[in-house]
From Swiss-Prot:
Binding site for FMN: F288, E289, G305, V306, S307, R313, G314, G315, S316, T362, S514
FAD-binding FR-type domain segment(s): 237-342
Family membership: Belongs to the PDR/VanB family.
Induction of synthesis: Expression is induced in response to 2-benzoxasolinone (BOA) exposure.
Organism: Gibberella moniliformis (strain M3125 / FGSC 7600) (Maize ear and stalk rot fungus)
Protein name, per record: Reductase FVEG_12641
Length: 561
């Protein structure tokens, strides 16, 4: 008799991990393999999830069981050669009252191996098992479930329930090949990571709150790139505590603040992405949340240039007048994937024309250093009130900078600074701008009148949330029947629907965050969608969307399971 699971990994707080129990030697009950079938799931999906038993000996090669095929490039290969699933889960699935409980039978998850005594709780990453007389297997990752499970079990909640419960199974590498057969013994030989069970890995990468040290440990496990990248990205993007280690004026009203990470962490790639910005929380009694351009540094140690706003709501005044050496802030790095995508679309040899006003110079200092090191062409048009108020002048190459000093009667002519297209209609420059809203608006107007395509224009505007251009803003009405919660929210240009929903505490599941796995699918009740995801079936479009990449047009109404 099965038991309905109450586990919900995305709502957990994980601060420590217990050592996983050691599995006793088990018996191989089934060996399964299957061929690719077109239209196997609901007549629409090509899959090899339907596998048949092999009663006699079968060869297990470096890429898995002989005769087993994989329809997706993300399945199979040497890193995911063999899939195993705990057969004890099937009665528990039937206890969840899915529409067709009989579909939850041994083999239904597409597993190659069915054994006794092994589970998500007692199998660890890096474990090495001996199967039969010859074969050695190494656990490489939890199974990464996808939208096909919904079709396999004819249950729209199948994928989400698999993620929430952590009953996903695991994949293995074949370290030593050989024949395997029903009745063989499988036993644990080595366990280098005793607390990193398959379930614990999922808990750490999916939990609402998780220790940064655990995330850092997770990035060092011998897992597949898919799960390592998920752990690395979560570690990089998580809010971290920093200490102010240096502060000084670099202009009359600009204070350069340098922060160092408080707790030691191992971060595989500490460099910030291009066009990254800092999302900071600071203050004592009153907490401020602001976004600032990152002047230099990496996740371990970075600097901001903060201008004292004459009309400050308290944020810049606090950072100038109250923040002292040794004080702490929280920072999480923001990214601008739209800008990086535009970089990829443009010829790298194009001249970059920067139109900047005042403190807007901080938005492009890292980019200019990068272009300088690569020998890429650029020219900066920098409008300032006076030399005394101009920040970071010592970092600007004189031969690539034109200053416009208002106190000396000089004015930046934006229409003259933006190059016109060639006689054949080609554009030889990209336009970058950051500064007062009036300057950026004029820059955009001139560029549009000249016919510049959107991917050749880059505007940094933290006044609207800052640092991104994922698409047009839209409104979303959210219903959550389980909690009787109803909210109406705005999704800004620099955030995804997934970001906004989870920031509001809706706990929407996610996995790949690229629109390919189906984990963050939400039901569409009303409205039009700009679809960018690949996981939805044709018949699902208009009825659902992927919160990580799909965007509403105008206003949406959605329902969250």
């Amino acid at each position: 008799m099965g038991v309905q699971s109450t586990a919900n990994l995305p709502k957990e707080t994980v601060s420590h991990l217990d050592t996983a129990p050691t599995p006793k030697p088990g018996v191989l009950l089934q060996v399964r393999a299957g061929r690719i079938k077109k239209g196997a799931l609901g007549g629409e999906i090509t899959s090899a999830i339907y596998k048949q038993q092999h009663d006699g000996p079968v060869f297990c090669s470096a890429t898995g069981v002989l005769g087993d095929e994989h329809a997706s490039s993300g399945h199979g290969g040497t890193e995911r050669a063999v899939h195993q699933y705990n057969p004890d889960h099937y009665p528990d699935w039937r206890a969840e009252n899915p529409p067709e409980p009989d579909l939850y039978d041994v083999g239904a998850y597409g597993e190659n191996l069915v054994t006794t005594n092994m589970s998500d709780e007692n199998v660890c990453i890096g474990d090495i098992y001996k199967l039969g007389d010859d074969v050695l297997l190494e656990v490489s990752e939890p199974r990464h479930p996808c939208f096909k499970l919904n079709s396999r079990f004819k249950w729209p909640r199948a994928l989400k329930r698999t993620i929430r419960t952590g009953r996903a199974g695991w994949n293995m590498r074949v370290l030593k090949t050989g024949n395997i057969c029903k009745g063989d013994t499988i036993s644990l030989l080595e366990r280098p990571y005793p607390k990193w069970s398959v379930l614990n890995v999922q808990r750490v990468i999916r939990a609402r709150n998780v220790s940064l040290n655990l995330l850092a440990e997770c990035t060092q496990l011998p897992m597949t790139d898919l799960f390592l990248d998920i752990a690395k990205e979560r570690l990089r993007s998580a809010p971290k505590t920093y200490t102010l280690v240096d502060a000084h004026l670099v202009a009359q009203r600009v204070r350069k603040l340098t922060f160092a990470l408080k707790e030691p962490l191992t971060i595989v790639n500490p460099a910030f992405d291009p066009y990254a910005f800092a999302q900071v929380t600071f203050g004592r009694e009153t907490k401020f949340e602001r976004s600032y351009s990152i002047v230099d540094g990496d996740i371990y140690k970075f600097s901001l240039g903060v201008s004292l706003d004459r009309q400050s709501r308290g944020g810049s005044a606090y950072l100038h007048n109250e923040l002292k050496i040794g004080d702490q802030i929280e920072m999480s790095p923001g990214s601008n994937p739209g800008a990086m995508e535009n970089d990829a679309k443009c010829d790298e040899s194009l001249t970059r024309v920067l139109i900047v006003g005042g403190i807007g110079i901080t938005a492009f200092l890292p980019s200019m250093r990068d272009w300088e090191s690569k020998g890429l062409p650029y020219h900066l048009h920098y409008a300032i009130r006076s030399l005394e108020e101009a920040a970071f002048l010592d970092q600007l190459p004189k031969d690539k900078t034109t200053l416009y000093i208002r106190s000396e009667g000089q004015r930046l002519d934006i229409s003259g600074a933006i190059p016109k297209p060639n006689h054949d209609g080609a554009y030889n420059a990209r336009i970058f701008s950051c500064g007062p809203s009036g300057m950026m608006k004029e820059c955009e107007t001139v560029a549009k009148e000249l016919g510049y395509p959107d991917h050749m224009l880059h505007f940094e505007d933290f006044g609207s949330g800052g640092g991104g251009d994922l698409g047009e803003p839209f409104e979303v009405e959210v219903d959550e029947p389980d909690s009787n919660r109803h909210e109406t929210m705005t999704v800004p240009p620099n955030k995804t629907l997934l970001d906004v929903l989870n920031d509001a505490g809706f706990d929407v599941l996610y996995s790949c965050k690229s629109g390919a796995c189906g984990a963050c699918k939400v039901e569409l009740c009303e409205g039009k969608v700009d679809y960018k995801s690949t996981a939805l079936l044709g018949k699902e479009k208009g009825k659902a969307l992927q919160a990580c990449v799909d965007r509403g047009i105008g206003r949406l109404r959605i329902e969250i399971d």
